[in-house]
Curated annotation (Swiss-Prot):
InterPro entries: Dynein_regulator_LIS1, LIS1_N, WD40/YVTN_repeat-like_dom_sf, WD40_repeat_CS, WD40_repeat_dom_sf, WD40_rpt. Positively regulates the activity of the minus-end directed microtubule motor protein dynein. Plays a central role in positioning the mitotic spindle at the bud neck during cell division. Targets cytoplasmic dynein to microtubule plus ends, thereby promoting dynein-mediated microtubule sliding along the bud cortex and consequently the movement of the mitotic spindle to the bud neck. Keywords: Cell cycle, Cell division, Coiled coil, Cytoplasm, Cytoskeleton, Microtubule, Mitosis, Repeat, Transport, WD repeat. HAMAP family: lis1 (MF_03141). Self-associates. Interacts with NDL1 and dynein. One of its GO terms (biological process) is establishment of mitotic spindle orientation. Transmembrane segments: none annotated. The keyword Repeat applies. It holds the Pfam family WD40. This is Nuclear distribution protein PAC1. It comes from Eremothecium gossypii (strain ATCC 10895 / CBS 109.51 / FGSC 9923 / NRRL Y-1056) (Yeast). The keyword Cell division applies. Residues 64-93 form a coiled coil.
């Protein structure tokens, strides 16, 4: 039977000589070496690497290089497969069946960031401008930096907002079209800034009343007034009038550090170091209900507001998450929301259904003694360290963690849809994602993450 060789004659000869060299260097018996020479048809002079000026370690080097090349081929094939999957998903995600603007809320970022911003210090919070391609980054050195995402060679503006680290940012468009920015800090202060037309920060108010670290702030529009709520390590939540700078309400919802809050109308949800989440009526300070399941401090809470009963139904509303978590419920209309989400240092994210308080005419709402605890709807498990931030966009829930990963979850099924396993070289502190409002004329698809290594990853379509 004829033999078919893959290698040509000269390469076979080199391989045979290299095998003999390797066996000799390994100290094999002379009989084995002689047998190999006879098998390969080589003389003793041909197998002498020193005499022929041949590298005696050639076989070992070739073998190692083949392994490295094979590993590189596997990595490239995996990357090619990921890019192919993303490319195939673009038409359905971006345009859907009925054209662009219907399914854009289902967009998920690609595997690799479009570009990266470096601010040189730990990024503690990120916010997007509501209508312009501008990102505001807060750092642990007290700076706030504004970047134009389409011209990122230099920051638009940077200011030393606080003497110590900035803990959070909040943005709100004022009635006159200007942009208001709130910064909270470890220096016990909260400041309100105006981002002017010439891309500069102008200080409007300094709010000083907290006696410890100010953790987070949140704007609230109440009629013609614009209010700001803050929470602090001094155990209090305070509500401020942004025009006068007066504190109009202060109350204590927890007995430990209040780390996070979210407002909707007259109601506020807070999360604390005591591992509980509480619903309060802030004008009266009444505590209404609470959630007890987490075992470690709460890092972030989010309210999922209901759609107004008068809101027109769009094709995007056919999505299950719109029908379930955002649909109008007349019983909850005084509250304005039915569900909230929390994340904690116990590595868990929990979706909660909020019990209805007792609504009494001409009196503040009271706790419902028959149901004082939130109802657990779903627990999202997957992170292996503290979950630091969460954001909701359509039916997608995004989360970041100290395990250096970002995850995208389906709010309806609880399934983890996508994982960015090494999204950063350091702990990921914060996320920011553009609006998921279906009538948003911008239809932006932006996603940002900030980490302790001073990098901000920007994902865009």
């Amino acid at each position: 039977m004829s033999q078919h060789h893959i290698l040509p004659q000269h390469q076979r000869a080199d391989l045979n000589r290299s095998i003999c060299d390797y066996v000799q260097r390994c100290g094999a018996e002379e009989s084995l070496v002689v047998g190999l020479r006879q098998l390969f048809g080589l003389s003793a002079e041909e197998c002498d690497a020193t005499r022929n000026g041949r590298d005696p370690d050639l076989l070992l080097k070739k073998w190692n290089s083949i392994i490295r090349l094979h590993r590189k081929i596997l990595d490239l094939e995996q990357k090619c497969q990921q890019l192919t999957e993303e490319l195939e998903a673009v038409p359905t995600e971006a345009y859907g069946k009925a054209g662009r603007g219907v399914s854009h809320v289902l967009w998920t970022p690609r595997s690799n960031p479009t570009f990266q911003l470096d601010v040189g210090a730990s990024v503690t919070d990120i916010k997007l401008h509501p209508s312009l391609p501008i990102a505001f980054l807060a750092t642990d050195q007290g700076k706030v930096v504004a970047y134009d995402l389409f011209n990122r060679s230099m920051p638009l503006h940077s200011t030393q907002a606080h003497m110590k680290g900035v803990t959070s940012l909040a943005v709100m468009e004022a009635e006159n079209g200007s942009l208001l920015i709130s910064t909270t800090s470890k220096d016990l202060q909260c400041k309100i800034w105006s981002f002017t037309d010439n891309a500069a920060f102008q200080l409007l108010r300094t709010l000083s009343s907290h006696e410890h670290i100010v953790s987070q702030s949140c704007f609230l529009r109440s009629g013609s007034d614009l209010l700001l709520a803050t929470c602090s390590r001094d155990l209090t939540v305070k509500v401020w009038d942004t025009k006068s700078g007066w504190c109009i309400k202060s109350f204590q919802p927890h007995n430990q550090w209040v780390r996070t809050l979210e407002l909707h109308g007259d109601y506020v949800i807070t999360g604390s170091n005591d591992a509980t989440i509480r619903l309060s009526h802030w004008p009266s300070g009444n505590g209404l209900s609470m959630a007890v399941m987490h075992e470690f401090p709460i890092e972030r809470v989010l309210i999922i507001p209901m759609r107004a009963n008068t809101a027109q139904k769009t094709e995007a509303d056919d999505d299950q998450v719109e029908l379930e978590y955002r649909k109008y419920d007349p019983d909850y209309s005084p509250l304005g929301f039915k569900y909230c989400i929390s994340c904690s240092r116990d590595n868990l994210i929990v979706l909660w259904k909020i019990p209805l308080p007792k609504f009494i005419p001409h009196r503040p709402p009271q706790p419902n003694l028959l149901q004082t605890n939130f109802e657990k709807v779903h627990v999202f498990k997957g992170h292996t360290s503290w979950v630091r931030d969460i954001k909701v966009r359509g039916r997608h829930l995004f989360s970041c963690s100290d395990d250096r990963s970002i995850r995208c979850w389906d709010l309806v099924t609880g399934q983890c849809l996508k994982v960015w396993p090494e999204a950063s070289h350091g702990f990921i502190n914060c996320l920011s994602v553009d609006s998921d409002v279906s009538n948003d004329k911008l239809l932006r698809e932006l996603f940002l993450s900030g980490s302790i290594d001073g990098k901000c990853n920007v994902f865009m379509r």
